[in-house]
């Protein structure tokens, strides 16, 4: 019985039961959607305040504004380099495996993507994107849970609080206590993670069914193989270069990975990841700056999917993309994959923008992806989560803001828990 008190076991069991319910009783599975939605909403309820307090405390305690700029600069350079690497790996594998070759477009099931292509074909409005980052109303930014707007306000508030020096110490102490309250709340919410994972998985299988993925199984297989290679080859090499174990890190965040697998949302574990990265040895200031920005700008899994989906559609329509056109895909996605972050249906908006820039692949090809997109979202979310944690560790290490002793203690503690179970 002690085994079933472990969150990992609970989530795995919930996901398996969800799959069974969705397959055997699809109508019942469809009715389970509110369970997953309610859990994700509960997490989203505390995301904005947790981001605010973590960033403000991190900047205020760091004090040195030059260091804040340095951490932010290193994070953005890392994000751009690694997401570009993900795009290149995606293109390389899709050109070798050719999952779209031989598929007959006219015989494949299609969905309605008009809501994504109406504006997507015109590309991302960069002026609107930049102006949107600055909130016109602070309360509205928190109410909507807009991560970029909350991030912008939090950085300004943290800089202002740090500038007060000793006068701001009482505010820092108060915020520190309040932040602990919010992390306590997220701890309570996470006890319901198995229920949320069950509901989300039962709905996914019940609503979409496994039949919808059969025609495009080659694309799914190619994407998942690429994600596996990216994590266990590319990211593993990066981890070794910076002197830490990918395996220990993955074992440390296994609960979060399973929750993301069940809910298909990396946002569902954002607060827990911030707490976990601190416990793993990263300083609060680095965690506060890197994790939230990574959720918008360091989307490794999404980058892999977008590059592969673009070439896949070209293969379906028999379009032979030149090296120059594939370089254009990388350049366009380097920008648009960040520009549409956090927007509902952003994957389709970005794909529409990319196809529009190339002007050789019909936009209606996006309709092919609707049936399998939901089954690839788990992979995207998991790789995004893994990538953001690794980015945080690397930036912390490069700034001497990583506590090796704390990291060893966290890993040893995890091993003791495993032995106890």
From Swiss-Prot:
HAMAP family: C4_dicarb_transport (MF_01300). Keywords: Cell membrane, Membrane, Symport, Transmembrane, Transmembrane helix, Transport. Induction: Induced by succinate and fumarate. Expression of dctA requires the DctB, DctS and DctR proteins and is decreased in the presence of malate. NCBIfam families: PRK01663.1 (NF002461). It holds the Pfam family SDF. It is a multi-pass membrane protein. The keyword Transmembrane applies. Belongs to the dicarboxylate/amino acid:cation symporter (DAACS) (TC 2.A.23) family. One of its GO terms (cellular component) is plasma membrane. One of its GO terms (molecular function) is fumarate transmembrane transporter activity. One of its GO terms (biological process) is L-aspartate transmembrane transport. The keyword Hydrolase does not apply. The chain crosses the membrane at residues 9-29, 39-59, 76-96, 145-165, 185-205, 219-239, 316-336, 348-368. Responsible for the transport of succinate and fumarate, but not malate, across the membrane. Its main location: membrane. This is C4-dicarboxylate transport protein. It is found in: Cell membrane.
């Amino acid at each position: 019985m002690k085994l079933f008190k472990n969150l990992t076991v609970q989530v795995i069991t919930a996901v398996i039961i969800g799959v069974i319910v969705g397959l055997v009783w699809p109508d019942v599975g469809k009715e389970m959607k509110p369970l997953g939605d309610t859990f994700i909403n509960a997490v989203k309820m505390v995301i904005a305040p947790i981001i605010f307090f973590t960033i403000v405390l991190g900047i205020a305690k760091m004090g040195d504004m030059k260091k804040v700029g340095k951490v932010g600069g290193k994070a953005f350079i890392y994000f751009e380099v690694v997401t570009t690497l993900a795009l290149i790996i995606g293109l390389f594998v899709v050109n070798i495996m050719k999952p779209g070759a031989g598929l007959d477009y006219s015989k494949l099931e299609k969905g309605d993507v008009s809501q994504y292509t109406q504006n997507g074909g015109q590309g991302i409005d960069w002026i609107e994107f930049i102006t949107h980052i600055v909130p016109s109303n602070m309360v509205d930014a928190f109410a909507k849970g807009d991560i970029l707007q909350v991030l912008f306000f939090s950085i300004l508030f943290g800089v202002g609080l740090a500038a007060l020096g000793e006068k701001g110490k009482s505010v820092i102490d108060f915020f520190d206590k309040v932040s602990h309250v919010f992390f306590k709340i997220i701890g309570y919410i996470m006890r319901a993670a198995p229920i949320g994972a069950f509901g989300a998985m039962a709905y996914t299988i019940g609503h979409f069914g496994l039949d919808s993925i059969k025609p495009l199984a080659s694309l799914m297989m190619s994407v998942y193989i690429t994600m596996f290679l990216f994590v266990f080859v590319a990211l593993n090499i990066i981890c070794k270069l910076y002197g830490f174990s990918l395996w220990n890190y993955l074992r440390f965040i296994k609960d979060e990975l399973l929750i993301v697998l069940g809910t298909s949302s990396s946002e569902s574990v954002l607060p827990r990841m911030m707490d976990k990265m601190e416990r793993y040895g990263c300083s609060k200031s680095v965690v506060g700056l890197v994790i939230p920005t990574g959720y918008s700008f360091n989307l490794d899994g999404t980058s892999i999917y977008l590059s592969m989906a673009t070439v896949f559609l070209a293969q379906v329509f028999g379009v032979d993309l030149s090296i120059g056109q594939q370089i254009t895909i990388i350049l366009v996605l380097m920008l648009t994959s960040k520009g549409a972050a956090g927007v509902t249906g952003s994957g389709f908006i970005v794909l529409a923008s990319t196809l529009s820039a190339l002007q050789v692949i019909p936009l209606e090809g996006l309709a092919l992806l609707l049936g399998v997109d939901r089954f690839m979202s788990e992979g995207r979310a998991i790789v995004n989560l893994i990538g953001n944690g690794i980015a945080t560790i690397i930036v912390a290490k490069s700034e001497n803001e990583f506590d090796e002793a704390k990291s060893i203690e966290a890993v040893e503690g995890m091993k003791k828990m495993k032995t106890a179970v």
